[in-house]
Amino acid sequence: TNMVTIAGEYKSDSFDKDEIEKIIRNVVAEIGYEQKGFHHEHLNIYNELHGQSPDIALGTDNFGAGDQGLMFGYACLETENYMPMAIYLCHKILERVQDERENHAWILPDNKSQVTLTYSDVNKPKNVDKIVCSTQHSEDIDIEHVRKIIEEIIRDEIKEDLGNTKFLINPTGRFVVGGPDGDTGLTGRKIIVDTYGGYAPHGGGAFSGKDCTKVDRSGAYMARYLAKNIVSSGKAFNATVQLSYAIGVVEPTSVYVYADGKVRPDL
C-alpha cells in the first residue's frame, strides 16, 4: 500500500525525476485517493525509468513500427459514436457516478460497471438485461442507501428502457477498501475494458504508457479510425479491421477487413 512504481524506457534529451514524481502525486490526487492505504501525500514512489535501447531506436527513427504485433479496430451502428452499446453504457454510468461525487461525499474513486444486453438481431440490442455497478464508499454509509442512490443515478443517466432490468449494485454488500489499497493495480491489465468490451478481437497489446511509435497504440487507433469510417459511410453495419506490423517497418505487413459477417477486400 501507499506505493507507486513507474518503470519503462524513454527517449528524451531531458529527464526530471522530481517532475515525474510531482506528476504522479498530482494524478493520484486528481483521481481522489486520500485514504489511509493510498494517499497522494504519503506515496512511496519507485522510479525505474531508463533510456530506450538503441537497437529499438534504430527501427523508429525513420517512423518504423516500434514492435511487431496485431491490432484491431471495431465499429458498429449500435450507438451514435459507433461503439458497442454495452461498453458505451458502462462508460456513461461510470462517468456519471464520478460526477456525482460532488453531491455525495461517500462515493469514493474506485468504481466499475458491467452491462448485459439481449439482442433481437446482429447490431440490434433488444433491452438492457442486467446492470452491475460496484461503487467504493465510505465506511459510515448504509449499503441499502448506496444501492438506492446508485440505482437512481443510473436510471437518470441511461435513457434506454430499464423496466425489466436487474440491478446488481455492490453485490458483495461492502466496498470500503478500494483502489491500489485493496487490489494491486497495473496499467494495461484491462485491455478489453480499454477497447470494445469483448465485441471484437484483441491483439494483446495495451495502450498505457506508450507513444505513437508503439503500434500497439497508434496501430489500434488507426484500425478503429478505418472501421468507424467504413460504418459511418454506410458501407457496413459493423466492421473489424486488423493490421499487423514488423518492427522497424513503416507499412503494415497485412490489412484485413471483416464486415457484416464476411471478408470484405473491396473495402
Q: Which role fits each region the language model picked out?
A:
Residues 1-12, 247-251:
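Short, charge-patterned binding micro-sites
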Residues 14-15, 174-188, 244-267:
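Short glycine/threonine-rich loop-to-helix capping motif typified by GTGT followed
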Residues 8-24, 28, 74, 78-79, ...:
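Glycine-rich and small/hydrophobic secondary-structure elements
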Residues 75, 79-95, 210-234:
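Alpha-helical support elements that line or immediately flank enzyme active sites
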Residues 2-4, 14, 22, 27-176:
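Glycine-rich, mobile lid/loop segments that gate access to catalytic sites or pores
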Residues 40-47, 166-170, 236-246, 252-258:
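Beta-strand segments within the central parallel beta-sheet cores of soluble alpha/beta enzyme folds
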Residues 10, 49-52, 119, 173, ...:
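Acidic, glycine-rich active-site loops and adjacent beta-strand->loop/helix elements
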Residues 140-231:
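Glycine-rich anion/phosphate-binding loop at the beta-strand->alpha-helix junction
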